[in-house]
Amino acid sequence: MMNIKSKNEEFMLFNQLSDEWWNENGKFKILHQIKSHRMTYILDQIKNRDIKNLKILDVGCGGGIMCEPLARLGAKVTGIDFAPNNIKAAKIHSKNNKLKI
C-alpha cells in the first residue's frame, strides 16, 4: 500500500511531467508506441456495440493519449486524472484538435 508521502511524490511528478504527454519522443514515448495495441484491444472489447452510442470514462487519463482516438471514432469520452496539469494538457491538446472530451 502506498503511503501519503509516496502519493504526494507521485502527484508532484506527474503534475511536473504534464508538458511531456504529447511529445512522442519524450518521457511518455512508450505510451505513444503502444497506443495502437491498446486501441485494438479496446475496440475488440466493444466490437458488438456502436461506439457512437458509448460513453467512455478514462480514469488516469494523463494528457488524453487514449481519449482522443476514442473521441475521433465518435465515443463520448470523459477523462479524469489526479494531476490538474495533466487535465490542462489534455484539454489544450483536444481543443487544438477540435475534439470534445
What is each PLM-predicted segment?
Residues 7, 32, 80:
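Flexible, glycine- and charge-enriched loops at secondary-structure boundaries
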Residues 32-52:
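Conserved alpha-helix/loop element of class I SAM-dependent methyltransferases that forms part
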Residues 40-43, 47, 64, 68, ...:
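Amphipathic, non-transmembrane alpha-helical secondary structure
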Residues 57, 65-101:
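Class I SAM-dependent methyltransferase SAM/SAH-binding core
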Residues 26-29:
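Class I SAM-dependent methyltransferase Rossmann-like catalytic core
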Residues 52-60:
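Conserved class I S-adenosyl-L-methionine
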